Amino acid sequence: MPITFHITGGHAHLRRIAKTTLDWSHLRLGITSIIPRTITLTIEKLPDYCGECLPSKRPNDFTISISPEQSIRDFVGTVIHEMIHVRQYIEGEWTGDGERECGELEMLLTDELWRSGLI
């Protein structure tokens, strides 16, 4: 079953970058689904952090918020960081708050995506 992405807020160029990053990262992270899933990503000013990922009220759905107030590279890294949290939620596997895995992978994967020429 497909994963559906809904992206709102922000300028059109950030929505395009977010869509490319979501498409690439869900495949790269092995986030596949036998049941339909929806990931809603909102680009909006956040109080004092770059992004967050939370399970939605609907089972199997997730809500991601990303701050536009960062460099493009950091924006991409934050989307990937939050997609790692999606994978952690789906698999039910993480240590502590899951930040260590995100910290180890986010810029490594950001650079991999950057080198691919998709962004």
Language-model-detected regions and their locations in the chain:
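Short strand-loop junctions, especially beta-strand C-caps/beta-turns
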Residues: 8-10, 67-69, 89-91
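Hydrophobic (often cysteine-bearing) scaffold residues that line and stabilize catalytic clefts
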Residues: 14, 18, 76, 80, ...
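Short pre-active-site segment immediately N-terminal to the catalytic Zn-binding motif
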Residues: 62-79, 93-94
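Post-HExxH zinc-binding segment in Zn-dependent metallohydrolases
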Residues: 93-119
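Catalytic glutamate of the conserved HExxH
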Residues: 78, 82-86, 90
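Auxiliary, metal-adjacent structural segments of Zn-dependent hydrolase domains
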Residues: 2-58, 62, 111-114, 118-119
